[in-house]
């Protein structure tokens, strides 16, 4: 999890109130849901770890904003000064198949008092890269000195070897490089080359290249201590991640009094960024009482949510005329706000307006958690239940842990992938036809995740494809759930635990995966098993086998078919297999 460096003098200045270093380090900051890693009383520095669901707290400005609410210094949605700029950015069709999403903002009036402020900004940027951007894959942030930028901007896909798009990358002044040379010679280029495919995404102004996302910015637009105005660009492959990253960073910079200016995105699509939209939620007072275990009134819940830096208004059950309650006028920007939804609960509720910096509010319970934090967990009175139940480890989980430990001793690395997948990867790329067993999502958000996986091996193939830049051989496994349709089940589907394993690298073959499977069966004390030939379209014919015990198939393994390797753009042989955990457990006598 990200570790945030907080200098006491910086925090107190933004906070606007004297608070002792000891109180901050030992009481207040931990109350925000963080784990203090290091306290340096001589340098007056606190290093604290925040959960990945709160990127808005990854800088001293975000921590100060939260503490203002906790201490009652300032409550409600922060008031930011937002207006339109005359800056435009044009997106060309060429980039849509590579890195299609672009969001841009200008932030004026930023003050860097000393080198620490610059270091904080860079640290904040990298934390967002890791948590929201998934190490720049989904979103990458570029921060520029706006005075060095000559709008309008142009975002397009260039030939990596075209010298007309050569530029001086950061930390290499005087060394003009093409995008291809950056990928070969620059340390950041080598680190992120795997995110760049055939062409090079380029963000340019009238003077030339200002950024080669997601790799490196131009030295020309370097931010220094004298910089007062910033241009912030966020590019990526996922719109939500891109907008979340932009909103979090501009809102935190605005905590120092900076002004946010929007930018018009034109060309392949049109939108104004940042959008600064609010989300609207209704929190039933009864639900908050039940989850927190305290007797809260509607007015008290409203106050707690305001202290959590949300907009909140208590709406009693009999006052439904407030269902058209307007959005708070806290963002000074002309915008077409979406229609405010009616209140659906037939009980007392608190209507909550959530600012765009809070990327983690996915359910009303998230808001109730915020209320609990503001109430102060130290005030909760623990109670001892008047009953107890003896516990023991679940036998299935015990067996799964034995399998996990056994494979770890065999030098395999465990992978945890999503249970959602696309039919493309679950079937076609594995040379299979859809069989109607997959559970489909009614309202998928992304085309990559429209069904629940029916087996795990495709997920491992995707993992190997994403890690081609890592050294070989690669030995990975996953223990996880798969779900299949079952008309006889109460829910219409059944879930099962599966084990999948794969080895990738030059020279791997059937004998290597066979020896691994045999060793695993011996370690699990499976008896009476035999290996027989099996046909499976994902494997090379004649190089696939099944493991049987008492006439029941435990799983299968073999050499992955070359067509499957091609579909996943893999250039080395892969062997793998998949086993039913319940069948393995039965055969092992658990």
Curated annotation (Swiss-Prot):
Disulfide bonds: none annotated. Keywords: Aminoacyl-tRNA synthetase, ATP-binding, Cytoplasm, Ligase, Magnesium, Metal-binding, Nucleotide-binding, Protein biosynthesis. One of its GO terms (molecular function) is ATP binding. Its main location: cytoplasm. InterPro entries: aa-tRNA-synth_II/BPL/LPL (IPR045864), B3/B4_tRNA-bd (IPR005146), DNA-bd_dom_put_sf (IPR009061), Phe-tRNA-ligase_IIc_bsu (IPR045060), Phe-tRNA-synth_IIc_bsu_arc_euk (IPR004531), Phe-tRNA_synthase-like_B3/B4 (IPR020825), Phe_tRNA_ligase_beta2_arc (IPR022918), PheRS_beta_core (IPR041616). It comes from Methanopyrus kandleri (strain AV19 / DSM 6324 / JCM 9639 / NBRC 100938). It is found in: Cytoplasm. Mg(2+) binds at residues 360, 366, 369-370. GO terms for biological process: phenylalanyl-tRNA aminoacylation. Its EC number is 6.1.1.20. This is Phenylalanine--tRNA ligase beta subunit.
């Amino acid at each position: 999890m990200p570790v945030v460096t907080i200098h006491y003098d910086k925090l107190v200045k933004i906070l606007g109130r004297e608070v002792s270093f000891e109180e901050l380090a030992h009481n207040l900051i931990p109350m925000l849901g963080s784990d203090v890693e290091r306290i340096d009383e001589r340098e007056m520095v606190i290093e604290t770890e925040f959960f990945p669901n709160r990127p808005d707290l990854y800088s001293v400005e975000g921590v100060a904003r939260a503490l203002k609410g906790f201490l009652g210094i300032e409550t409600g949605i922060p008031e930011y000064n937002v207006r339109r700029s005359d800056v435009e950015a044009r997106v060309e069709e060429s980039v849509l198949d590579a890195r299609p999403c672009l969001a841009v903002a200008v932030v004026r009036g930023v003050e860097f008092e000393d080198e620490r402020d610059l270091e904080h900004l860079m640290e904040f940027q990298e934390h967002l890269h890791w948590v929201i951007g998934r190490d720049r894959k989904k979103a990458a942030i570029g921060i520029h000195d706006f005075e060095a930028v000559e709008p309008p901007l142009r975002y397009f896909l260039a030939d990596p070897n075209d010298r007309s798009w050569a530029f001086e990358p950061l930390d290499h002044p005087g060394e003009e490089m093409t995008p291809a040379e950056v990928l070969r010679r620059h340390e950041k280029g080598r680190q992120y080359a795997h995110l760049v495919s055939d062409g090079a995404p380029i963000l340019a102004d009238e003077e030339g290249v200002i950024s080669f996302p997601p790799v490196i910015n131009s030295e020309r637009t370097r931010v220094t201590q004298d910089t007062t105005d910033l241009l912030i660009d966020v590019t990526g492959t996922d719109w939500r991640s891109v907008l979340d990253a932009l909103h979090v960073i501009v809102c935190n910079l605005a905590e120092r009094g900076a002004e946010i200016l929007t930018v018009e995105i034109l060309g392949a699509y049109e939108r104004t960024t940042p959008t600064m939209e609010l989300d609207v939620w209704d929190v039933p007072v009864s639900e908050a009482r039940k989850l927190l275990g305290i007797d809260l009134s509607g007015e008290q819940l409203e106050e707690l949510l305001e202290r959590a830096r949300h907009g909140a208004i208590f709406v009693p059950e009999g006052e439904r005329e407030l269902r058209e309650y307007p959005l708070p006028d806290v963002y000074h920007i002309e915008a077409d706000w979406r229609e405010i939804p009616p209140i659906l609960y037939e009980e007392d509720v608190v209507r909550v307006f959530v600012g765009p910096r809070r990327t983690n509010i996915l359910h009303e319970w998230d808001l109730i958690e915020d209320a609990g934090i503001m109430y102060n967990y130290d005030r909760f009175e623990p109670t001892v239940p008047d009953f107890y139940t003896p516990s023991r480890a679940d036998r299935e989980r015990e067996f799964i842990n034995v399998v996990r430990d056994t494979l770890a001793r065999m030098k395999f690395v465990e992978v945890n992938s999503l249970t959602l997948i696309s039919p493309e990867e679950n079937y076609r790329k594995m040379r299979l036809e859809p069989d109607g067993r997959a559970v489909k999502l009614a309202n998928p958000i992304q085309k990559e995740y429209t069904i629940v996986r029916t087996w795990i091996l495709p997920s491992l193939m995707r993992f190997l494809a994403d890690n081609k830049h890592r050294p070989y051989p690669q030995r990975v496994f996953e223990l996880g759930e798969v779900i299949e349709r079952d008309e006889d089940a109460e829910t219409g589907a059944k879930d099962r635990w599966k084990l999948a394993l794969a080895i990738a690298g030059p020279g791997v073959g059937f004998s290597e995966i066979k020896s691994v499977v045999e060793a695993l069966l011996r370690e699990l004390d499976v008896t009476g098993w035999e290996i027989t030939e099996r046909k499976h379209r994902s494997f090379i014919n004649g190089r696939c086998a099944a493991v049987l015990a008492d006439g029941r198939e435990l799983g299968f393994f073999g050499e992955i078919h070359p067509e499957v390797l091609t579909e996943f753009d893999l250039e080395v042989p892969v062997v793998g297999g998949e086993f039913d955990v319940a069948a393995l457990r039965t055969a092992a006598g658990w």
